[in-house]
Amino acid sequence: MKLFYLLVICALSLAVMADEKPKLILPTPAPPNLPQLVGGGGGNRKDGFGVSVDAHQKVWTSDNGRHSIGVTPGYSQHLGGPYGNSRPDYRIGAGYSYNFG
């Protein structure tokens, strides 16, 4: 009988402790500034395949968040087909953005 009471007391104490929320609540970290990637391709055996990859990365933002500058590099190439491989096309661009808000 003592064992039964001991088990009941343990079960009740565990049930009470399970309802308590943790006291330590950490703030959610800011998401990292990762680049946006876009890629694509397609084709067939007869005409060859095209491949393209572009990225966009914000490199600077003003303190108030209204002004920002971004960089956009890219690569594309046609592979195979009746005329063979094309030369790779490398490109890079920069852009400025203003938020009217």
UniProtKB/Swiss-Prot annotation:
Alphabetic keyword roster: Amidation, Antibiotic, Antimicrobial, Glycoprotein, Immunity, Innate immunity, Signal
Additional note from the record: There seems to be a family of diptericin in protophormia. Diptericin A is the predominant member.
Keyword flag Glycoprotein: yes
Keyword field contains Cell inner membrane: no
Signal peptide start-end: 1-18
UniProt function note: Has activity against E.coli.
Similarity annotation: Belongs to the attacin/sarcotoxin-2 family.
UniProt induction comment: By bacterial infection.
Organism, as annotated: Protophormia terraenovae (Northern blowfly)
GO biological process: defense response to bacterium; innate immune response
UniProt-recorded name of the protein: Diptericin-D
Phenylalanine amide: modified positions: F100
Glycosylated residues in this chain: T28, T72
